[in-house]
Swiss-Prot record:
PANTHER family: RHODANESE-LIKE DOMAIN-CONTAINING PROTEIN 7-RELATED (PTHR43268:SF3), THIOSULFATE SULFURTRANSFERASE/RHODANESE-LIKE DOMAIN-CONTAINING PROTEIN 2 (PTHR43268)
Source organism of the structure: Pseudomonas putida (strain ATCC 47054 / DSM 6125 / CFBP 8728 / NCIMB 11950 / KT2440)
Annotated keywords: Oxidoreductase, tRNA processing
Gene name of this polypeptide: trhO
Protein name: tRNA uridine(34) hydroxylase
Family the UniProt entry places it in: Belongs to the TrhO family.
Active site: C178
């Protein structure tokens, strides 16, 4: 591809006892390589999405892989014409993806990884229960044909959804997927602990499936939400047509942008009647700053939103 900016989603579950000490050298490496975005560090591993030039991303990956614990860190790439991030951050967390269930440790037990080339065959098996582990607003944009939508607002709700709806003695084969592989990997560890026997998850997530499976063979329907300013990507990993409401963070399509309830940066049909006056005023002020920065051809550091896959 000819686009100048490389967007790299990366993660690995691995015990990092020194994760606090890793923060500063990791941040310095990102800054030295002019890499933008946010990486999360916790005792259970590393997670995040970053962007930069080819040389910059390669420099960061080389530094990470110089640590024997991260030599095989999982990463997926896509491309765009402009920087999707304006800030460079390394944050310390309790979990690199928040499930909120003590004792769930993907470093000790996870389900069976399924390569993208084998995924279609698995999910076409009528005995396989296919679960989308992502949040409701992500599923609404696109998902695999036949997948169950848990309708969760956060990953923290996933355990209760499983307990309320599925029985290990009845549901013998379970396959799960997520954007980059991290949520479904942690979900598989949780489900094994709950007694589910045959648990599968898509290695590298939806993004790796897009990367490796030809579009004409795809069982995916729609776009895929991504955690940067592109908002969504298509199967060919090109930027989708969605924008994102900066007030409620909900993806919005062309029809929703045409709504009388849509005001750029302030509200959309999903939130216009639920915003507090304080939030609305803050959004209006923020949008004015963004527009002023654009008029001056300057980047606006709070004009874009990043959140690690959660």
């Amino acid at each position: 591809m000819s686009q100048a900016i490389v967007v790299a989603a990366l993660y690995k579950f691995v015990t990092l006892e020194d994760y606090v000490e890793l923060r500063e050298p990791l941040l310095k490496t990102m800054l030295d390589n002019n890499v933008k975005g946010t990486l999360l560090l916790a005792q259970e591993g590393i997670n995040g999405t970053v962007s930069g030039t080819r040389e910059g991303i390669d420099g960061l990956l080389a530094w990470l892989r110089s640590d024997p614990r991260l030599v095989d860190i999982d990463h997926k790439e896509s491309y765009c014409d402009e920087q999707p991030f304006y800030r460079t951050k390394v944050k310390l967390k309790k979990e690199i993806v928040t499930l909120g269930v003590p004792g769930v440790d993907p470093n000790k037990a996870v389900g069976t990884y399924v390569e993208p080339k084998d995924w279609n065959a698995l999910i076409s098996d009528p005995e396989v229960l296919l679960i989308d582990t992502r949040n409701d607003y992500e599923v609404a944009i696109g998902t695999f044909k036949g997948a169950i939508d848990p309708k969760t607002e956060t990953f923290r709700e996933f355990p209760e959804y499983i307990k309320a709806n599925f029985d290990p003695s009845k549901h013998k084969k379970v396959a799960m997927f997520c954007t980059g592989g991290i949520r479904c990997e942690k979900a598989s560890s949780y489900m094994l602990g709950e007694g589910f026997e045959s648990v599968y998850h898509l290695k590298g997530g939806i993004l790796k499936y897009f990367e490796e499976v030809p579009q004409e063979e795809s069982l995916w329907d729609g776009d895929c939400f991504v955690f940067d300013n592109r908002v969504t990507v298509r199967h060919d990993l090109s930027e989708g047509e969605y924008d994102q409401c900066h007030a409620c963070r909900h993806p919005i399509n062309a029809q929703e942008r045409a709504s009388e309830h849509y005001s750029p940066g302030v509200s959309c049909p999903h939130c216009w009647d639920s915003l507090s006056e304080k939030t609305r005023r803050s959004a209006i002020d923020r949008q004015k700053q963004i527009e002023l920065a654009k008029a001056r051809n300057l980047p606006h550091p709070i004009g874009y939103y990043y959140k690690a896959e959660a």
